[in-house]
Amino acid sequence: MDYNRMNSFLEYPLCNRGSSAYSAHSAPTSFPPSSAQAVDSYASEGRYGGGLSSPAFQQNSGYPAQQPPSTLGVPFPSSAPSGYAPAACSPSYGPSQYYPLGQSEGDGGYFHPSSYGAQLGGLSDGYGAGGAGPGPYPPQHPPYGNEQTASFAPAYADLLSEDKETPCPSEPNTPTARTFDWMKVKRNPPKTAKVSEPGLGSPSGLRTNFTTRQLTELEKEFHFNKYLSRARRVEIAATLELNETQVKIWFQNRRMKQKKREREGGRVPPAPPGCPKEAAGDASDQSTCTSPEASPSSVTS
């Protein structure tokens, strides 16, 4: 059996020892370095107890020879034979783990502590190694669980807080649309025609329906005066139950109508003497009216 290949693996067993396994004084936190030269080429790390891994493989007989418990100041029962030494460890590390140092798994070079099961089982309270020795064993914990959890807790707490889904903020209330002056469009309300009483005009500018009496009085006044003074306009408006604006507009329209008639009347040929004015607008070929100087022959012809 090649024992040299087994020396390239380290074992860090769990040290969950009870209070009965220690003396009144506590064990030192670090072990004195050994003067023996280690077989493997890896230097010991101070966090594993200082020189813990170097003296563990100083013999080529196959099993690591470690310092007896008496040199560490910790009394352990010497139930293990002289060829086997109980594993020493620091009380601040986890269960036994197997660390391959440079060799593949197919070589079968793992340092398995199954051969120490019977000897480790006889220790007080037992060790949490992988041996199948008798005796109650405490539950195993992940290596460096407490230290790593404490060191990574702040960092992971920030990540977990970021991963948590934050509740969606309630949508802000839509502010009412502000109306500016340039957005306002001035629109005049539509004018609705109101049925007014006869003779009562409205100042809204709608068409006024005059009665026969009102029209007769306005025509009589227009025959005498084409233009009215303001005093006369107010008097006529009060007499006919109209307002001043209605009287003013009626006279304006009446003057425009008179001028139109005069323009149209200038195109009609003047009526011969002796004919009534009503016949002036008839056709020129009408011969109903004859001058007194006309001969009877011209009339018959």
Swiss-Prot record:
The keyword Chloroplast does not apply. Its main location: nucleus. Keywords: Developmental protein, DNA-binding, Homeobox, Nucleus, Transcription, Transcription regulation. Residues 203-262 bind DNA. GO terms for molecular function: DNA-binding transcription activator activity, RNA polymerase II-specific; DNA-binding transcription factor activity, RNA polymerase II-specific; protein domain specific binding; RNA polymerase II cis-regulatory region sequence-specific DNA binding. One of its GO terms (cellular component) is nucleus. SMART domains: HOX. GO terms for biological process: anatomical structure formation involved in morphogenesis; anterior/posterior pattern specification; embryonic skeletal system morphogenesis; facial nerve structural organization; facial nucleus development; regulation of transcription by RNA polymerase II; rhombomere 4 development; rhombomere 5 development. Coiled coil: none annotated. Residues 19-38, 55-70, 284-301 have a biased composition (Polar residues). It is found in: Nucleus. It comes from the Eukaryota. A motif (Antp-type hexapeptide) lies at residues 179-184. Residues 19-77, 127-149, 255-301 are annotated as: Disordered. Belongs to the Antp homeobox family. Labial subfamily. Sequence-specific transcription factor which is part of a developmental regulatory system that provides cells with specific positional identities on the anterior-posterior axis. Acts on the anterior body structures. This is Homeobox protein Hox-B1. The gene is HOXB1.
